[in-house]
Swiss-Prot record:
PANTHER family: BNAA05G37150D PROTEIN-RELATED (PTHR31111), F-BOX ASSOCIATED UBIQUITINATION EFFECTOR FAMILY PROTEIN (PTHR31111:SF25). This is Putative F-box protein At3g52320. CDD domains: F-box_AtFBW1-like. Gene3D superfamilies: 1.20.1280.50. Residues 21-71 form the F-box domain.
């Protein structure tokens, strides 16, 4: 009797130990992508090891293109570097949320350190969440979200050199363009040469096939801008002639475009309704005027008639007096403005001016506590870039 009772108890224990396996229906791939696309990049890097399916989805071009859609939430970065000491730099980041001030202007606060120890040097360009920067002749590409860095082959030319970085949407490739040039004592460019590198395994520099007028960058550390797979950058052919160069990232063809303004000082190039435009702000500090011409035909160097935008009276106190630094924004029809010099322990403020709506669309602030040694002198910084990424 006792032995049979023990057997019965053991059977019940074994039954309890049995695990119930429930087979759940598989999540459709499109639904899985919709879920994963909402996650930050750091989480996606970890989730690649969940399964082979997740790895293939996260690393696919389709997923990457959806992840970097302009409409997706973006984070604002600021990159500061000292021209005299390229190892002295800061990479700062805004929090994900923004607030509104009393005038209903969106306010973003750059309040987080994202500095990566082995970075440094000048920022070349930011494209679809990746940063390209250089120190000397070393060019590197960094993903600030995953903190991964790739160093490109060293450029061996002994002449002057500068770079640009962009994304070719037709072939879904990232390319780095290098320009080498030689000038006379009169600053006339006698020779220039371009090389291009496609980012990937075994990447190497090669000469471009397209011929072009010898030129050099408009000024040192000159950044370009990309619209629909075409890279645009300012250039000089001699001391008295400035032009706009275009480089098709797919066909790798160059085009020289004459500028619409005879006086090209204090001009920037920007995205205006999907077209490249030249913005001249010579009269901004005195009168609040910004003049814009839009490129209509690149082959004929044909521009639209000049259109003048007038800054709101409420913002004239900001632009009046001290020298302004004006830069292009990723957003169409908007420019970034900041003071060239700031006082110690003062917030670094940037304004995103929407020319179409004639209003300050966004205010960007950098907390003084993040600036460290950059805040020890009245000369706030030598080079400052702000850019958006996923």
């Amino acid at each position: 009797m006792g032995s049979s009772l023990c057997v019965a108890v053991r059977k019940k224990e074994k039954q309890k130990q049995k695990k119930t396996v429930v087979f759940l229906p598989e999540i459709p791939e499109e639904m899985l992508i919709d879920i994963l696309i909402r996650l930050p990049a750091k989480s996606l890097m970890r989730f690649k090891c969940v399964s082979k399916l997740w790895l293939s989805l996260i690393t696919s071009r389709y997923f990457t293109n959806r992840f970097f859609k302009p409409s997706s939430p973006s984070c604002l970065f600021a990159y500061l570097v000292d021209r005299e000491n390229q190892s002295k730099y800061l990479l700062l980041q805004s929090s994900s949320s923004s607030r509104h001030d009393h005038s209903d202007t969106s306010v973003s606060v750059i309040d987080q350190h994202s500095t990566i120890p082995i970075m440094g040097g000048y920022l070349v360009n930011a494209a679809r969440g990746l940063l390209c920067y250089r120190t000397g002749r070393r060019v590197k590409v960094c993903n600030p979200s995953t903190r991964q860095i790739v160093e490109l082959p060293i450029m061996r030319s002994k002449t002057n050199v500068w770079n640009w970085f962009g994304h070719d949407p037709f072939h879904d490739e990232y390319k780095v363009l290098s320009l080498f040039w030689e000038v006379t004592k009169e600053q006339t460019v006698v020779r220039s040469e371009h090389q291009v590198l496609v980012l990937g395994v075994g990447a190497s520099w090669r000469n471009t096939k397209s011929h072009h007028t010898p030129h050099r960058p408009f000024h040192p550390y000159s950044r370009g801008m990309t619209i629909d797979g075409v890279l645009y950058y300012s250039a000089r052919t001699d001391a008295n002639r400035c032009v706009l160069m275009s480089f098709d990232l797919s066909s790798e063809e160059f085009n020289l475009i004459e500028l619409p303004f005879e006086n090209w000082s204090r001009t920037i190039h920007m995205n205006y309704q999907g077209k490249v435009a030249t913005c001249q702000y010579m009269r901004l500090a005195s009168d609040g005027f910004v003049d814009v011409c839009v490129l209509e035909d690149a082959d004929k160097s044909q521009w639209s008639n000049k259109k003048t935008f007038v800054l709101p009276i409420s913002q004239m106190n900001f632009v009046h007096g001290d020298r302004l630094v004006v830069g292009a924004s990723r957003d169409s029809g908007k420019v970034l403005m900041r003071k060239a010099n700031l006082l110690r322990n003062q917030h670094a403020r940037f304004f995103l001016y929407d020319m179409e709506r004639n209003e300050i669309a966004r205010r960007i602030e950098i907390r003084p506590s993040l600036l460290g040694s950059f805040n020890k002198t009245n000369q706030f910084l030598k080079v400052c870039y702000t850019f958006q990424t996923k």
